[in-house]
Amino acid sequence: MTKFEAKRIYEDLSNDDGYRVLVDKLWPRGVSKEKANLDEWCKEVAPSNELRTWFSHDPNKFLEFKEKYLEELRNNKDLKEILSRWNKKDKVILLYGTRNKDCNQAVVLLEYIKQVV
């Protein structure tokens, strides 16, 4: 069974990171492609531009953001194929750029994956 975790892309690489997937729409500032050491940049699972802009990483909006993002995930036609691909890996790290480790799309995506997988 695949193990999924969320991790900030600015954290140091770990030998046990597994398959590293950036789940942001935008490339994180100050991170080179070499430093990111990505296996995949999956913009398809990131929140829509409208939702991302509205949320603007405001913790006061997180609960509403979570609800809206979960709705986007439920309606995402590509997600089934993406999860099927990820489920072939031993470990998948969902990478995000924001500083807030508790209020971000990777946390919501991780929760969603754990419910549907």
Where would I find each of the regions flagged by the language model?
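Residues lining hydrophobic/aromatic ligand-binding pockets adjacent to catalytic sites
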Residues: 1-117
